[in-house]
Amino acid sequence: MTITDLVLILFIAALLAYALYDQFIMPRRNGPTLLSIALLRRGRVDSVIFVGLVAILIYNNVTSHGAQMTTWLLSALALMGFYIFWIRTPRIIFKQRGFFFANVWIEYNRIKEMNLSEDGVLVMQLEQRRLLIRVRNIDDLEKIYKLLIENQYLKI
């Protein structure tokens, strides 16, 4: 096993750990889920570049009669990239005391201001950061509003 194979195994393990955390562990952290909303994906250009570069590496390894183990590891890396970038759906998960956005826990008391832009983007201003929440279904913005009002996280 070469150093290249070890690095590939490390990257595959890291992507697998991230996928498991995102799919199974994060929704169970910090209490029961009150609301889970699907978000729009950001640009897929980065993902196309990543999967394309891995495909080039697979092609190069096969044509130069490289190690079969490396080809399999590169294929596994390409599949993990495909899952994370195209199959997995980004979500915002609302809990009792806060919410997960981009895998980061944010307490409700950190929200200083909320606005809705003309194109349907919910803007939450935190102490030093601005969150741009782009929901997949525009009706989900009303669900978020109702949740925040009913639980009195948002003061009118």
Curated annotation (Swiss-Prot):
The keyword Cell inner membrane applies. It holds the Pfam family DUF986. Keywords: Cell inner membrane, Cell membrane, Membrane, Transmembrane, Transmembrane helix. Residues 1-5, 66 are periplasmic. It is found in: Cell inner membrane. Its main location: membrane. GO terms for cellular component: plasma membrane. InterPro entries: DUF986. The chain crosses the membrane at residues 6-26, 45-65, 67-87. It comes from the Bacteria. Residues 27-44, 88-156 are cytoplasmic. It is a multi-pass membrane protein. Belongs to the UPF0266 family. This is UPF0266 membrane protein YobD. It comes from Salmonella typhimurium (strain LT2 / SGSC1412 / ATCC 700720). The gene is yobD.
